[in-house]
Amino acid sequence: MSDTWSSIQAHKKQLDSLRERLQRRRKQDSGHLDLRNPEAALSPTFRSDSPVPTAPTSSGPKPSTTSVAPELATDPELEKKLLHHLSDLALTLPTDAVSIRLAISTPDAPATQDGVESLLQKFAAQELIEVKRGLLQDDAHPTLVTYADHSKLSAMMGAVADKKGLGEVAGTIAGQKRRAEQDLTTVTTFASSLASGLASSASEPAKEPAKKSRKHAASDVDLEIESLLNQQSTKEQQSKKVSQEILELLNTTTAKEQSIVEKFRSRGRAQVQEFCDYGTKEECMKASDADRPCRKLHFRRIINKHTDESLGDCSFLNTCFHMDTCKYVHYEIDACVDSESPGSKEHMPSQELALTQSVGGDSSADRLFPPQWICCDIRYLDVSILGKFAVVMADPPWDIHMELPYGTLTDDEMRRLNIPVLQDDGFLFLWVTGRAMELGRECLNLWGYERVDEIIWVKTNQLQRIIRTGRTGHWLNHGKEHCLVGVKGNPQGFNQGLDCDVIVAEVRSTSHKPDEIYGMIERLSPGTRKIELFGRPHNVQPNWITLGNQLDGIHLLDPDVVARFKQRYPDGIISKPKNL
């Protein structure tokens, strides 16, 4: 870049010398050019820095000789300081070169007047600034800066710092060089016409400097700008602080929520016993290198005459259908309590702690209505006589193309069930599995429910391990079941956020769902009427009416339900309607 700039400065000074000679020629009284010796007046020395003597003319004084000053080397640090000073928005314009030199000079790196003047001329040629200095003024008068293009100066400052954009700057300088050459050619042509055939001469263009390789490392200026842009403003910090305070308020539990949680908290302590990780007492003592097993619950191996211990544990354990002949190892709970174990009596749950106690004097939530049930075929029962319910739960016998120990319902029979009459506002819990998951969603929409949640039951075996050899599943063994949760209308008075949507429980008999689901539903809607469809004897629960064809007769206690049932079925027999 410096070689190109030097060439431009040399051309500009040659132009100034030629223009000065033309001005002096015009001021002569004769106003005519000496054609006998035109080279003495018009031929500038483009190739030499030494002054060229001119021959005397007959009608005027000798023109003064002009020499081209040697080009100063450009100081990168001085150029950077000058760019930074000129790009300052607080700089008052116009200002002269002397004031600029004093402003950017430091004791460690003083700036010279010639260097500042040269850089100002360079910036003016690059159209970064505008300077005011007449062609005929003396060199003693400093250059006056009248205008500064701050956007271009900022861009140039970044280019100098990063040493990027070298090609763009070189292109701009090359354009200035071409314009200077065009001006020089025009003046030379005019002088040749006045000299009646004077041979025109032009300087050879300077060679283009080779392009330097661009460096991709980020400069300190870019890093500082990026850090400033990444910093949050005061307004953003205040807004973030307010948002955090609002979030903390929203996440804080209210007094009502705390009261509800306390209402359903286990009294005294949880009435459960934890299983030992090592299974049997022998493995527990071996692992802990102790004389006695831990106080957790253990298992005992069942070793029969036909048992082959080398085969390992049975995959189905206590759910095995052929335990009388199965050769694999089975287990049972080792309920024997070591009375000599220290602290064993302290950890035995007392009967007093297991009693239900009311909280806050309000016993309405703790009041449970005795269980009720009706043995019937749900397809033919007029369920409208049972009234309205807050929660409906169903475990339908889906036709999943598998041999089951009970009868199944077809898809059309499931769709025709009169479920909508049981509720105006409330929740429906629908157990689905396999291909029935899509059919269950279809039935929810058909019955007027919107699916809002889905409970997952992760099945564990007797040893509290994940099931890997389930009896269901075609491509993969199923180790879980799904319970779709649908909502109808606008239910009020339900508790939100008390339980999660995952149940981890042991597998029992076929289609025997975990008892934890009843606790979840009771905490969701305490003290309300609930009904379960397709239930069995183990499903009867307080506050629930259970319907199914495997129950023991009819057991109704609600006076209103009893009256409507006797009116609809006087003989107590629920038979298939004649129109079906």
From Swiss-Prot:
Q: Which domain of life is it from?
A: Eukaryota
User: Which residues lie in Basic and acidic residues bias regions?
Assistant: 28-37
Q: Where, in this chain's numbering, is S-adenosyl-L-methionine bound?
A: 377-378, 395, 513, 536-539, 549-550
Q: Where is the composition biased (Low complexity)?
A: 55-67
Quaternary context: Heterodimer; heterodimerizes with METTL14 to form an antiparallel heterodimer that constitutes an active methyltransferase. Component of the WMM complex, a N6-methyltransferase complex composed of a catalytic subcomplex, named MAC, and of an associated subcomplex, named MACOM. The MAC subcomplex is composed of METTL3 and METTL14. The MACOM subcomplex is composed of WTAP, ZC3H13, CBLL1/HAKAI, VIRMA, and, in some cases of RBM15 (RBM15 or RBM15B). Interacts with NCBP1/CBP80. Interacts with EIF4E. Interacts with EIF3B.
Quote the record's domain comment.
Answer: Gate loop 1 and gate loop 2 regions are adjacent to the S-adenosyl-L-homocysteine-binding site and display large conformational changes upon ligand-binding. They may play an important role in adenosine recognition. The interface loop contributes to the heterodimer interaction.
Tell me where the signal peptide lies: none
Modified residue annotations for Phosphoserine: 2, 43, 48, 50, 219, 243, 350
* Role noted for this protein: The METTL3-METTL14 heterodimer forms a N6-methyltransferase complex that methylates adenosine residues at the N(6) position of some RNAs and regulates various processes such as the circadian clock, differentiation of embryonic and hematopoietic stem cells, cortical neurogenesis, response to DNA damage, differentiation of T-cells and primary miRNA processing. In the heterodimer formed with METTL14, METTL3 constitutes the catalytic core.
Protein name, as recorded: N(6)-adenosine-methyltransferase catalytic subunit METTL3
Q: How is it modified after translation?
A: Sumoylation inhibits the N6-adenosine-methyltransferase activity. Sumoylation does not affect subcellular location or interaction with METTL14. Desumoylated by SENP1.
Instruction: For the region Positively charged region required for RNA-binding, give the residue spans.
Output: 465-478
Q: Where in the cell is it found?
A: Nucleus; Nucleus speckle; Cytoplasm
Region (Gate loop 2), start-end ranges: 507-515
Explain the regulation of its activity: Methyltransferase activity is regulated by miRNAs via a sequence pairing mechanism. Methyltransferase activity is inhibited by sumoylation.
Q: Which residues does the annotated region (Interphase loop) include?
A: 462-479
Which residues are annotated as site, described as Interaction with METTL14? Answer: 438, 441
Any one of the GO CC terms? nuclear speck
Q: Which reaction does it catalyse?
A: an adenosine in mRNA + S-adenosyl-L-methionine = an N(6)-methyladenosine in mRNA + S-adenosyl-L-homocysteine + H(+)
